[in-house]
Swiss-Prot record:
GO terms for biological process: vitamin E biosynthetic process. The chain crosses the membrane at residues 98-118, 122-144, 168-188, 227-247, 254-274, 276-296. It comes from Zea mays. This is Probable phytol kinase, chloroplastic. It is found in: Plastid, Chloroplast membrane.
Length: 303
């Protein structure tokens, strides 16, 4: 809790982003934000919302079921691209980066499926936690899974699972536990890591003949793609969560700040320190820092 509190700013009447979290004491009861989200999704009036709320399962059952569903979906996603790669329907490098992009985007998109209980984030955290355990087991060669290794590593070596892929799921885990769905910091950080960094590699491999003068491993096309895709995905995910009532966004202010965050993440991704610090660590950490500086002073928790 102390870690989460450190990222919250002072209350302001003109706050850029307002959390819609329910009170802890009434976490299991339908909140105004929850009712609003149901109205948005159903397109119906209050009576239907009340009926749906009355018929809703207990939070622990809802969160448990969603956790199982998302865990199965994450496993299936990797298996599908394993199969596509094995059949030579998609290049290995492209398969790896598509999984990189979709894993973060789909995981974030699933957060509204969880209840409004205070324990919901811990259920969501089970998904990246299980994936991290899986990567550790196969990365340490305690068991073997050639399909997994081929689909998410560059050179097909099991020990690679302990670097980029493991860092990736650990950032997912950290973002869920510390920020969750009411904070723009976690949303933007995961958007830049999954979408921005992912598309930078995809575009850079195909159109990256013009290299950066200070880093010959990076290209202008890849860096520009990272800025644009990271910015757009961040904005879309912010729109997604704001439309469901988790955050309020003043877009005239938010878009400029998102552009600054995307620029900072792009600069960090361009720096030639890949051999020392993996992009899956440097990009989200830089994004979190800049997003915290830009957004935290305008963010308040509404109880």
């Amino acid at each position: 809790m102390a870690a989460a509190a450190a990222w919250t700013g002072a209350a302001s009447p003109n706050s850029l982003l307002l959390s819609r979290s329910p009170p802890h004491a009434a976490a299991l009861a339908p909140s105004p934000g929850s009712s609003m989200r149901r109205r948005l999704l159903l397109g119906v009036g209050t009576p239907a919302v009340a009926a749906l709320a009355a018929a809703a399962p207990p939070a622990v059952l809802q969160d448990g079921a969603v956790t199982v569903l998302i865990t199965a979906g994450a496993y299936s996603l990797v298996r599908v691209f394993d199969e596509l790669t094995e059949r030579r329907l998609i290049e290995k490098s492209l398969s790896r980066k598509v999984v990189h992009v979709l894993s973060g985007v789909l995981f974030m998109s699933s957060w509204p499926l969880f209840s409004n209980s205070t324990e919901a984030r811990y259920f969501a955290a089970v998904v990246p936690f299980l994936n991290s355990m899986r990567l550790l087991i196969y990365g340490l060669r305690l068991y073997t899974d050639e399909a997994l290794v081929k689909s998410v590593t560059r050179e097909g070596k099991p020990e690679e699972l302990l670097r980029g892929p493991l860092y990736y799921v650990l950032v997912l885990l950290f973002s869920v536990l510390v920020f969750w769905r009411e904070s723009p910091i976690g949303i933007v950080s995961l958007s830049m890591m999954s979408g921005g960094d992912g598309f930078a590699d995809i575009v850079g491999r195909r159109y990256g003949s013009a290299k950066l003068p200070f880093n010959r491993k990076k290209s202008w096309a890849g860096s520009i793609s990272m800025f644009i895709s990271g910015f757009l995905l961040s904005a879309m995910m912010m729109l997604y969560f704001s439309s469901l009532g988790y955050i309020d966004v003043i877009w005239e202010e938010a878009l400029g700040k998102l552009a600054l965050v995307a620029l900072a993440a792009t600069v960090v991704e361009c720096v030639p320190v890949t051999e020392v610090v993996d992009d899956n660590i440097s990009v989200p950490l830089a994004t979190m820092l800049v997003a915290f500086l830009l957004f935290s002073s305008n963010r308040t928790i509404v109880n």
